Amino acid sequence: METEQQEETFTNTETNGKRPAEDMEEEQAFKRSRNTDEMVELRILLQSKNAGAVIGKGGKNIKALRTDYNASVSVPDSSGPERILSISADTETIGEILKKIIPTLEEYQHYKGSDFDCELRLLIHQSLAGGIIGVKGAKIKELRENTQTTIKLFQECCPHSTDRVVLIGGKPDRVVECIKIILDLISESPIKGRAQPYDPNFYDETYDYGGFTMMFDDRRGRPVGFPMRGRGGFDRMPPNRGGRPMPPSRRDYDDMSPRRGPPPPPPGRGGRGGSRARNLPLPPPPPPRGGDLMSYDRRGRPGDRYDGMMMQCHVDACDDMQPPELFEGGSGYDYSYAGGRGSYGDLGGPIITTQVTIPKDLAGSIIGKGGQRIKQIRHESGASIKIDEPLEGSEDRIITITGTQDQIQNAQYLLQNSVKQYSGKFF
């Protein structure tokens, strides 16, 4: 199991740009361990608007990359705001290609030279994450220090896939060096379990996987993606800069149009039954910072309004269940409280997970057209919020909220207000 250390963010704090000679020798040995002749595949998650920069007019740019570097380079089309750049070559060649591509991306075109901060999102199979993190986070810490980059490994897989996003930020040369080392690390480890590569046509605003589907900070001149803490102590990802609408084959967020086929049914979700009241409010607005939150009894029940159960598990273990079996049948709201022992957010206190069941006809008032409302609630609360699809024959949807107690209460308050404002109902 991945350790809590993966949730820490280490940055290089040295300011003089110099390191002891023995450290430099160690770093060089670390770099030279690569098998540079081995052909590997790199997949980078891009905004759709940047596909044109990679492809070029009439395919000029991508043809030049293929010819000049004798590599396989492709950016398949998609109907959403994301595309996947795929490069197959040896690691050194991949590095040279990335150095050519990064300055052409829309966010960085206005910079001269290579002295600017950038970000790339690498896709890896979920079973390879442990090889990047290392024992007690030692490997990812070493990577950050040796390459002078910021690395964030997202915990949630991309929609309907086994891929996870590794977000790498820093100077272009440093980011490329870090990616090359990661490619070597993962090429040494076989993939375990089934493999379902991410198809960007299935992107989903309600997944918190590190993609380009949340509100971006549009300020230029600095890398985005590390401003807040989110699920499990990870830094929260930036929201969407792209202007592309959702693909018409996907459901829209007002629940007015059909989706492209049902997603794979999540295991462990059947059998929950019982009527659920629809006129009970979410918990009250958050108290002043430092004030007491609602008390939970041994069954995780604040007062008598909620029917739930206490989950004594690490938040990472809870998240690894797909989704966690947290509820029992009964009347009233299903509510759970998961203690995230040892995992802390910037606002203080442990990272915990709460789930609330709502009538599915109220989901549109929370999500909004194109996911705008749910994005805003995530942004304002700092919490990770995921809305599950309703089970077949069910009239309910489950909202999973992860964060500190303050973040969760803020999110609940904003969700409640959104329903009141846009549906005229109160749940």
Curated annotation (Swiss-Prot):
Annotated localization: Cytoplasm; Nucleus, Nucleoplasm
GO CC terms of this entry: chromatin; cytoplasm; nucleoplasm; nucleus; ribonucleoprotein complex; spliceosomal complex
Q: Where is this region: 5 X 4 AA repeats of G-X-G-G?
A: 56-371
Annotated GO biological processes are: mRNA processing; negative regulation of DNA-templated transcription; RNA splicing
> Which parts of this chain are annotated as the region 2 X 22 AA approximate repeats?
51-385
Q: Where is this region: 2 X 6 AA approximate repeats?
A: 218-302
Question: Which keywords label this protein?
Answer: Activator, Cytoplasm, DNA-binding, Methylation, mRNA processing, mRNA splicing, Nucleus, Phosphoprotein, Repeat, Repressor, Ribonucleoprotein, RNA-binding, Spliceosome, Transcription, Transcription regulation
Q: Where is this region: RNA-binding RGG-box?
A: 209-246
The main place the protein resides is: cytoplasm
- What is a single molecular function from GO for this protein? RNA binding
Q: What range(s) does the KH domain occupy?
A: 39-101, 117-182, 351-415
Residue windows of the sequence repeats: 51-73, 56-59, 218-223, 230-233, 240-243, 268-271, 297-302, 363-385, 368-371
User: What residue spans carry the region label Disordered?
Assistant: 1-34, 221-305
Q: Where is the composition biased (Basic and acidic residues)?
A: 16-34, 249-258, 295-305
Functional summary from the UniProt entry: One of the major pre-mRNA-binding proteins. Binds tenaciously to poly(C) sequences. Likely to play a role in the nuclear metabolism of hnRNAs, particularly for pre-mRNAs that contain cytidine-rich sequences. Can also bind poly(C) single-stranded DNA. May play an important role in p53/TP53 response to DNA damage, acting at the level of both transcription activation and repression. As part of a ribonucleoprotein complex, may negatively regulate the transcription of genes involved in neuronal differentiation.
Q: What is this protein called?
A: Heterogeneous nuclear ribonucleoprotein K
Biological source species: Gallus gallus (Chicken)
